[in-house]
């Protein structure tokens, strides 16, 4: 079966909408034949399918990951669709248990209706499944938390022989299961610790990039949540900083019936920068619709309206559009030096920057294979959107390849659910617990039933 193990494949929406093949969400990789997809309606049926499977198995949620994470290798292999295994299973005063196939937006909506929230900040896209978010290390922003997986209290999995095992935080293998890459078993239930829902006020600013290396630390130390977009060519930064709302702001929010309160403000500080970026993006993508999704992700940088709302209303605002997304974690203590290296490299080489550099920082993670394992980290994000015909800007891709190589040289760890060039990384050197993770895999899945070409190369 054709797949990409590295590099950046073209989109093929026409082929993906026809024929017998199942493609990933971005429509740039074939995953399986439709007849190879199994859809269990219960955990018991899933156990039967796993026990009887003649080949290897991979699990799909929303299919938003690169093809290498999900693609099957042989006719006897099967892809498990967990779409029917969703919803809230139970809850108590401090935690809630969801089925693994529950989309994150349903998790957030159910918690909000209960007056609860996760301790972890959400990622920008909420259509992925809870189990998929754990498998790939999905994270948000804020140094007081790390990935969604770090808020897990208990994980229930169907193992390779069809049996079921529950892993709690005290289990010696728990930190392997927290971020398992889909290689240890099929997650059917996840218990997440929760807290009373809070309201946040987010402030939006445009600032010079001159002091970004130090400003980044200040924003993240002084505010509960912070996110920044850096335009190196224009030496500007669009930054969001958020804190818990004051009593007065909370009252305004509740008086607005739980809808976000937007404090309308106008500023032309980013207009020229945004217009230049849009012009370049139009040239790269040849997308004719001026209101197309890629353009909306940029035009919103002209918006400086502060906002009060719950954490999901404020930060879970991604616009899902097909793209190549590369995200590399660097220890926060070294992020400033890496920013300065990127700045010097950009000034010397003047690369074609398709989209601003996204900067999100998190606290240390306990997951053995988390890019933020045991250290506060800054995730450097880079995006190139697909053109109308499914192609990618050659100059934009050249930038991605060069900047990923630079970050890999700095000891960067890539986000598992996004695109990266695996040849740049020495996994055992980057992840001191890699050998321990492999040992857990051998114990839980000695025949490597939950495997494919990519995971075999990664884990052996």
What are these regions (language model features)?
Residues 100, 335-336, 349-350, 388-415:
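Extended C-terminal subregions enriched in glycine
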Residues 2, 240-245, 298-302, 308-311, ...:
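Short glycine/threonine-rich loop-to-helix capping motif typified by GTGT followed
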Residues 28-123, 137-142, 228:
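Glycine-rich N-terminal segment of FAD-binding domains in flavoprotein oxidoreductases
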Residues 331, 337-389:
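C-terminal structural cap/anchor segments
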Residues 62-65, 120-133, 153, 232, ...:
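Short, glycine/charge-rich beta-strand/loop segments that flank catalytic centers
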Residues 135, 153-337, 341-344, 348, ...:
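C-terminal substrate-binding/cap subdomain adjacent to the FAD-binding core in PCMH-type
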Residues 225-229, 323-325, 352-366, 414-419:
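A short glycine-rich, hydrophobically flanked beta-strand micro-motif that places a catalytic Asp/Glu
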């Amino acid at each position: 079966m054709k797949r990409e193990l590295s590099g950046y494949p073209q989109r093929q929406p026409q082929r993906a909408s026809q024929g017998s093949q199942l493609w990933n969400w971005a429509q740039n990789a074939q995953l399986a034949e439709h007849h190879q997809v199994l859809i269990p309606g219960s955990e018991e049926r899933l156990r039967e399918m796993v026990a009887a499977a003649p080949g290897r198995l991979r699990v799909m949620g929303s299919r938003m990951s690169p093809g290498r994470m999900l693609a099957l290798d042989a006719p006897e292999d099967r892809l498990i669709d967990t779409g029917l295994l969703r919803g809230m299973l139970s809850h108590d005063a401090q935690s809630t248990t969801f089925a693994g196939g529950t989309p994150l937006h349903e998790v957030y909506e159910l918690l909000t209706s209960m007056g609860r929230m996760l301790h972890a900040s959400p990622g920008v896209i909420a259509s992925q499944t809870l189990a998929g978010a754990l498998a790939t290390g999905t994270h948000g922003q804020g140094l007081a938390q790390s990935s969604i997986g770090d808020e897990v209290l208990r994980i229930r999995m169907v193992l390779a022989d069809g049996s079921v095992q529950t892993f709690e935080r005290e289990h010696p293998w728990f930190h392997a299961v927290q971020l398992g890459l889909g290689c240890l078993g099929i997650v059917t239930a996840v218990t997440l610790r929760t807290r009373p829902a809070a309201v946040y006020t987010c402030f939006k600013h445009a600032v010079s990039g001159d002091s970004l290396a130090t400003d980044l630390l200040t924003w993240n130390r002084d505010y509960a949540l912070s996110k920044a977009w850096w335009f190196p060519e224009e030496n500007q930064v669009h930054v969001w900083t958020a804190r818990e709302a004051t009593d007065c702001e909370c009252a305004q929010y509740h008086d607005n019936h739980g809808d976000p309160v937007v404090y309308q403000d106008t500023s032309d500080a980013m207009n020229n920068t945004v217009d230049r970026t849009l012009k370049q993006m139009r040239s790269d993508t040849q997308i004719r619709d001026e209101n197309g999704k890629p353009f909306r992700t940029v035009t919103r940088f002209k918006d400086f309206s502060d906002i009060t709302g719950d954490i999901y209303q404020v930060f879970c605002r991604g616009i899902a559009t097909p793209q190549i997304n590369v995200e590399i974690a660097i220890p926060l203590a070294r992020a400033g030096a890496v920013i300065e290296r990127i700045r010097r490299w950009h000034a010397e080489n003047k690369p074609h920057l398709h989209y601003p550099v996204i900067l999100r920082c998190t606290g240390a993670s306990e997951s053995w294979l988390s890019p933020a394992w045991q250290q506060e980290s800054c995730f450097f994000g880079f995006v190139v959107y697909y053109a109308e015909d499914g192609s990618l800007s050659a100059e934009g891709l050249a930038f991605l390849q060069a900047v990923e190589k630079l970050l890999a040289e700095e000891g960067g760890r890539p986000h598992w659910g996004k695109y990266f060039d695996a040849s740049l990384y020495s996994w055992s050197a980057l992840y001191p617990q890699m050998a321990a993770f492999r040992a857990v895999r051998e114990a839980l899945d000695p025949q490597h039933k939950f495997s494919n070409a990519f995971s075999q190369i990664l884990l052996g």
